[in-house]
Amino acid sequence: MAYQDALSIRELAQQHNALFGDSVALIASENVMSPLAREVMISDLESRYAEGLPHHRYYQGNNFVDLIEDKTNELLSKLFKTEQTDPRPISGTNANSAAIYALAKPGDLVAVPALSGGGHISAAEFGILGMRGVRTISYPYDKNTMTVDPDEASKIIKREKPKVCLFGQSVFMFPVPLKEMKGAFDEVGCKVWYDGAHVLGLIAGRKFQDPLREGADIVTGSTHKTFPGPQHGVILGNTDSETWKSVRRAVFPGVLSNHHLNAMAALGITAAEELEFGEKYASDIIDNAKALAGELYSLGFKVLAEERGFTESHTMAVDVTQNGGGKYVAETLEASGIILNKNLLPWDDNKKSQNPSGIRIGVQEVTRTGMGKSEMKEIASLIYRAIVKKEEPSKIKEEVKDLKSSFRHVKYCYGDVDAYEYIKLI
């Protein structure tokens, strides 16, 4: 019976792979790994432990782990042009946990992006910052672009004198105007922390902004969104040695013990691939995002930030109030084979999280599997037919499956593999 239970779980995992293999995946926080990265994820590294820093471990048997971590740090350093790299966090939120423990104490004031303006839940009072016991204050922002207003934010920074200024969003369409706020940072003497989880691959590809050269002391991020690696995290720095030591101590022994060695190795492989393919990949992501946003707008959808070209990242936000609301649209599209998520927009109360006004769309995964501008036009048409024309979801789903059949292989990497193939070992 237990064996049959195990097989039933495997069957569900196979069905999950098939679902995404036949769907257009537009979740802005997901991606698919390269063949080399996937391969190392099922290596013996998955079973092992390594506490501390390379060559100063608390466990034996880490000789090759140390070399892998050294190489990963070397590649990250080259990719992001900094000597301060830490590939140990096991997720973006784990990296954020280390950052807040290193940079602030309970009672300190931290300036953050508003949740209604696309801010991440880890910066909310019910997230990591709240659990750390810090006080928060939100930046004013442009409600149409969901971007911090640098002039008004500078006034607040100078007046309130936060210990830390945190930037970065989960609806991250435009670069943060860090340079415009540098005078306020310098006057107050705060640490500047940039959560680049969503745009890390665009930063690596030199197509978004360079936060470490624009005023950020610390950059945290997950490594599985526009940076197309494993579910893992990273911290980068351009700060003084004492602050960096505090960050590393916060990582271990502060917020983790073992750092998931297989994922760290996959991160290193992805960094190597980004050095070769990342610039083209980032450029194509942004081109596709602009194309899809423009097509949706031309079909009558209320895409935010029209006056700025809709987006400069992988993400766009769409107000679908007139189309039934975010919950209805997301569920209808899922039934039609198009997977994205409902999302709060600036004019929504947080209590509307179960049925907000908007949807969030990201194109990094469909770009990763080879889709281009012509496919963006086709996807926009499918969304229009499902939501506006209310065509039968099963009919749309078959067309989505047919479209996806030509775009299942991972690009911008070494090797060629079906991104959604289920790999059996027995």
Curated annotation (Swiss-Prot):
Homodimer. Pathway: Amino-acid biosynthesis; glycine biosynthesis; glycine from L-serine: step 1/1. Keywords: Amino-acid biosynthesis, Cytoplasm, One-carbon metabolism, Pyridoxal phosphate, Transferase. NCBIfam families: PRK00011.1 (NF000586). PANTHER family: SERINE HYDROXYMETHYLTRANSFERASE, SERINE HYDROXYMETHYLTRANSFERASE 1. The modification N6-(pyridoxal phosphate)lysine is found at residue 225. Belongs to the SHMT family. Its EC number is 2.1.2.-. GO terms for molecular function: glycine hydroxymethyltransferase activity; pyridoxal phosphate binding. Pfam families: SHMT. GO terms for biological process: glycine biosynthetic process from serine; tetrahydrofolate interconversion. Its main location: cytoplasm. The record marks 224 as: Plays an important role in substrate specificity. It is found in: Cytoplasm. SUPFAM superfamilies: PLP-dependent transferases. GO terms for cellular component: cytoplasm. Its cofactor is pyridoxal 5'-phosphate. This is Serine hydroxymethyltransferase. Catalyzes the reversible interconversion of serine and glycine with a modified folate serving as the one-carbon carrier. Also exhibits a pteridine-independent aldolase activity toward beta-hydroxyamino acids, producing glycine and aldehydes, via a retro-aldol mechanism. (6S)-5,6,7,8-tetrahydrofolate binds at residues 115, 119-121.
